[in-house]
A protein has these predicted regions:
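Membrane-embedded alpha-helical segments of integral membrane proteins
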Residues: 1-33
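Transmembrane alpha-helices and immediately adjacent membrane-cytoplasm interface residues
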Residues: 28-63
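Alpha-helical transmembrane signal-anchor/signal-peptide segments
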Residues: 61-80
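Hydrophobic/aromatic-rich, well-ordered segments within soluble, folded domains that form packed cores
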Residues: 79, 83-91, 228-239
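A short, structured loop/turn motif at beta-sheet edges
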Residues: 79-83, 137-141, 199-204
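Glycine-rich catalytic cores of cysteine/serine-nucleophile enzymes that process amide/ester linkages
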Residues: 84, 89, 95-192
Length: 239
């Protein structure tokens, strides 16, 4: 299944379907060979599978693609004492998903002023699937919100299945809360729910610094998004 899926989502046009079917037939022939004692069939499939693994390993994530505007820039965070400087912070004004004003900003936040952290769950496919955002609150400024996104290229559609097969890079978005929550509640008409965490200010600061470290790591070295293992929930859990 993995090999057929990889071929289907990584090859263009009708070639993708034909290659996936061909791989499935080869796998079936290999199983028949194991059952019948015909060694050439499973050996042939093993060679095919190893070749496919070699092709898989040749795919590398990149920051250098023609990204959609809202994911065109990755944030970076510099720390000097208790002050965090967040560059490439998104503060768009959304009227619809296609009609918006672009604003990228640099903002500074005082770690000593962190008061807590909130979670937003934005449900976009009934109750089954939600996108997670983490928002940090401060006593002297507006919240700072982070989201982990599929970094799509212009003209590229999102597919949960394609996300298993090195089809998308991962992106962090650092944003004004009105931008990133408003995009989902107003422009996309999603059902967003706010959960206030019981974390202490110190715990919230520690989580914020963990975000800062991983954001800078991603800016230095791109990663693949994976629907199961590297998504908006699992990455936050590992932080």
């Amino acid at each position: 299944l993995w090999g057929a899926g990889f071929l289907y989502f990584r090859l263009p046009g009708t070639m993708a379907g034909l290659a996936a079917i061909g791989f499935g037939v080869a796998a079936l022939a290999g199983l028949v060979g194991v059952w019948s004692g015909e060694a050439r069939l499973p050996l042939g499939f093993a060679v095919l599978f190893v070749s496919l693994l070699g092709w898989w390993s040749s795919f590398h994530p990149s920051h250098d693609r023609d990204w959609i505007p809202e994911l065109a820039r990755l944030p970076a965070i510099a720390q000097e004492g208790d002050v965090l400087t967040v560059s490439n912070l998104r503060n768009f004004r959304w009227r619809t998903e296609e009609d918006y004003d672009q604003h990228w900003e640099t903002r500074r936040y005082d770690l000593a002023k962190v008061t807590g952290a909130d979670i937003f769950l934005s449900y976009w496919s009934g109750e089954a699937i939600a996108h997670l955002l983490v928002s940090f609150t401060f006593s002297d400024s507006v919240p700072l919100t982070f989201s982990i996104e599929v970094r799509r290229e212009k003209g590229e559609d999102w597919s949960a299945l394609a996300g298993f097969f090195r089809s998308y890079e991962m992106a962090y978005v650092a944003a004004d809360e009105r931008d990133i929550v408003g995009l989902r509640t107003h422009a996309r008409k999603e059902d967003a729910r706010l959960f206030r965490l019981s974390a202490s200010p110190r715990q919230a600061r520690d989580l914020l610094l963990a975000y800062a470290g991983d954001i800078n790591d991603l800016a230095a070295k791109p990663r693949w998004y994976n629907t199961l293992t590297t998504n908006c929930t699992t990455v936050v859990y590992h932080l």
